[in-house]
C-alpha cells in the first residue's frame, strides 16, 4: 500500500510528504483493531445469548414433580442463594437428621456421556431434562443422623432407581462434630476409626441400614426431589452468571436483557 502511494505521488508530481494528511499505519491498525474487537464482542454475545436461551428453556420445561416434592414435607429445606449447597433438616425429641446436597454442574460429564437432548417424557407425563436424570444419578447426598449415642454419617448415590451407600461411618458422642455446612469434609478428614470401607460391609447390613433410613424419610423420592432442587439452583445461578457477563461486555444491552428475562 505504501509503495502504491509513493508511485501515485510521483506520477502526479506531488511529494508524498507534502500531502495534507499523511498516511499512518497506526490509524489503519487502530481501525482494524476496533473492527476486530467489535466482531469478537458480537460473537461472544451471540454465544452467551444462545446458552442463556438453552438454560431458560430447560428450566421452563423441567418442573418439580409433585409426587417427589411431597417426600420433602417433613423436612425444613434451606436454599440460601449465597451457599453452594442445599440442606434438608428434621429434628425430633430423640434425634436430628440433616441431608446435604452440593450444588455443581454435571453438564460436562453429561455431554461426554451422551449428546444433550432438551427434554424427555417421565412417568407422570411432565417434562423433565435428560441432564437432570443424569444429575440425579451422579451426585451424592450426605446424610448425618445424630442422637445422644453418636452420629452416623453416610454418602448416598442413586443407581438404577435404588439408593446405594458410597460411604458409611460412625462417630461416638465425644468425637461427633457439630452440624457442618460440608459433610464431605467430615467423611474425608476423620482421623479416627469410623468403620470399614463400604464395599467390605456385608450386603445384609447395608440393606437393613437403608431400611432404617427409609423409616426416617430418606427415600428414593426424597433424594430425587432434593437433588432436583440442587440441579435447579445451579442452573438458576448459571443463568444469572450469563446475565452478568452479557452486562459486562454489552452494558447498554444489560437492562434490556434483564427486562426480557423477567417477562
UniProtKB/Swiss-Prot annotation:
Coiled-coil region(s): none
Regions that span the bilayer: none
Record's keyword terms, sorted: Mitochondrion
GO cellular component: mitochondrial matrix; mitochondrion
Gene3D superfamilies in the record: Mitochondrial glycoprotein
PANTHER family: COMPLEMENT COMPONENT 1, COMPLEMENT COMPONENT 1 Q SUBCOMPONENT-BINDING PROTEIN, MITOCHONDRIAL
Organism, as annotated: Schizosaccharomyces pombe (strain 972 / ATCC 24843)
GO BP, sorted A to Z: cytosolic ribosome assembly; mitochondrial RNA processing
Record's subcellular location: Mitochondrion
Record's signal peptide: none
SUPFAM superfamilies xref list: Mitochondrial glycoprotein MAM33-like
The name this protein goes by in its record: Uncharacterized protein C15D4.11c
Pfam families: MAM33
